[in-house]
Swiss-Prot record:
Taxonomic placement: Eukaryota, Viridiplantae, Streptophyta, Embryophyta, Tracheophyta
Function according to Swiss-Prot or TrEMBL: May play a role in the regulation of plant growth and development.
Tissue specificity remark: Roots, leaves and stems.
Gene encoding the protein: MHK
GO molecular function: ATP binding; cyclin-dependent protein serine/threonine kinase activity; protein serine kinase activity
Residues the record lists as binding ATP: L18, G19, D20, G21, T22, C23, G24, S25, V26, K41
Catalytic site: D133 (proton acceptor)
Keyword Nucleotide-binding listed: yes
Catalytic reaction list: L-seryl-[protein] + ATP = O-phospho-L-seryl-[protein] + ADP + H(+); L-threonyl-[protein] + ATP = O-phospho-L-threonyl-[protein] + ADP + H(+)
This protein's name: Serine/threonine-protein kinase MHK
Modified residues annotated as Phosphothreonine in this record: T164
Boundaries of every Protein kinase domain copy: 12-291
SMART domains: S_TKc
Nucleotide-binding keyword on record: yes
Length: 443
């Protein structure tokens, strides 16, 4: 009897490697039948039985979670005792977007990213899972659409503690995880949300600890020492008892993020609370006033027009950026493509006042009898003629041998890679100084 074996992975042509981690590697590939570009995650360990595959945390979570802001698992393939996950392919991750920024994000851009992340997180928590590894690298973005990815550490809420000690990259770990509590809840995800929100304003991590002890120290420098009565986990701090007798130079989040609105500061303070019970849920965070802020003009139109003749050249914003040092146990697989979007070219005139927080569009073809007309950029993205969508560079789908591409910051003026070491925002608060905001279009 003749047996025909069909190899599913023959349908896919590997184009390039995107990332490599402890658990596996991720490749950009193309489906030879549909010409769809996908991300293929190949696990490093062998899988001899199908039951082993379907019981993986990542598989169990993604099979239950179908949401516009959660990465879509399209197919699972086991061949020759090797396991492959076929994901939708995204262009960037949030870490690389922040690393390549020359100017801070606008309030609207930050609200858009945060709203999408919280919507995906709310769906996850409602369905009985919490992520445990939220960080900018695991937030994938295409055309301003954000999706949560990498569910290798996802845990069912209903599962019984104790949980594993290692969770999340250190900079986004909640205090109860740093203190080795095994009884943590989905509130650990909400702490990470607060840290990411602050990072979107500062373009540098809020708590960049170099070790677990240094991580707790940096948290204390911003939040102050925990209340031992309302945060029982702090009693397990005996392994670093000196911290309980240390006086910390108090640095308010508002001082670290001078370009953030008061509503944003309030939300960060709530999310980054020592007490997990005081952190809002994802649904509660979505109802925070930060997401209902109306865009307001910082100056009257007449005042703006008087300043147009005195405009100076835009200052360069020098960013000290860093490379994430991968921890040995980390399973980040880098589902991102090195595709640089081409920014729409608009003729922009910006107010030079440091207090200014809005961009303006100058329309040279629209004039009245006295002076040029200046318009606030307050129209919604679907209004005609104001915002142009961000277009990605075309992807090459030629079936060439796998090539390795380098992802790096653009070599443009005003952008300098000065050091590979992590800058400390507490020591160098000028890193968070506001600058003119850049416009974007939301799809």
């Amino acid at each position: 009897m003749m047996v025909f074996v069909v190899f599913v992975m023959c349908r896919y042509k590997i184009l390039e490697e995107l990332g490599d981690g402890t658990c596996g590697s991720v490749y950009k590939a193309v489906n030879l039948e549909t010409y769809e570009v996908v991300a293929v995650k190949k696990m490093k360990r062998k899988f001899y039985y199908w039951e082993e595959c379907v019981n993986l945390r990542e598989v169990k979570a993604l099979r239950k979670l179908n949401h516009p802001h959660i990465i879509k698992l399209k197919e699972i393939v086991r061949e020759h005792n090797e396991l492959f996950f076929i994901f939708e392919c995204m262009d960037h991750n949030l870490y690389h977007i922040m690393k390549e920024r020359e100017r801070p994000f606008s309030e609207g851009e930050i609200r858009s990213f945060m709203s999408q992340m919280l919507q995906g997180l709310a769906h996850m928590h409602k369905n009985g899972y919490f992520h445990r590894d939220l960080k900018p690298e695991n937030l994938l973005v295409t055309n301003n659409i954000l999706k949560i990815a990498d569910f290798g550490l996802a845990r069912e809420v209903a599962s019984m503690p104790p949980y594993t000690e290692y969770v999340s990259t250190r900079w986004y770990r909640a205090p109860e995880v740093l203190l080795q509590s095994s009884l943590y809840t989905p509130a650990v995800d909400m702490w990470a949300v607060g840290a990411i929100l602050a990072e979107l304003y500062a373009l540098t991590p809020l708590f960049p600890g170099e070790s677990e002890i240094d991580q707790l120290y940096k948290i204390c420098c911003v939040l102050g020492k925990p209340d031992w009565t309302t945060f029982p986990e702090a009693k397990s701090i005996s392994r670093i008892m000196s911290i309980s007798h240390t006086e910390f130079p108090q640095t308010r989040i508002a001082d670290l993020l001078p370009n953030a609105a008061p509503e944003a500061i309030d939300l960060i303070n709530r999310l980054c609370s020592w007490d997990p019970l005081k952190r809002p849920t994802a649904d509660e965070a979505l109802n925070h006033p930060f997401f209902s802020m109306a865009t307001q003009a910082s100056y009257p139109i007449h005042d703006l027009e008087l300043r147009l003749d005195n405009m100076a050249a835009l200052p360069n914003l020098e960013l000290n950026l860093w490379d994430f040092n991968r921890e040995p146990e980390e399973c980040f697989l880098g589902l991102t493509l090195a595709v640089k979007p081409s920014a729409p070219k608009l003729e922009m005139l910006r107010n030079v006042s440091q207090d200014m927080s809005e961009n303006f569009l100058f329309c040279p073809g629209v004039n009245n009898d006295r002076e040029p007309s200046v318009f606030w950029s307050l129209l919604s993205p679907d209004e005609n003629g104001l915002h142009a969508p961000v277009e990605s560079s075309p992807l090459s789908l030629s079936f060439s041998p796998m090539q390795q591409h380098t992802v790096g910051p653009p070599q443009s003026s005003g952008f300098t890679m000065t050091s590979s070491m992590q800058p400390n925002m507490l020591d160098r608060p000028w890193m968070a100084v506001s600058a003119p905001f850049q416009q974007s279009h939301y799809l």
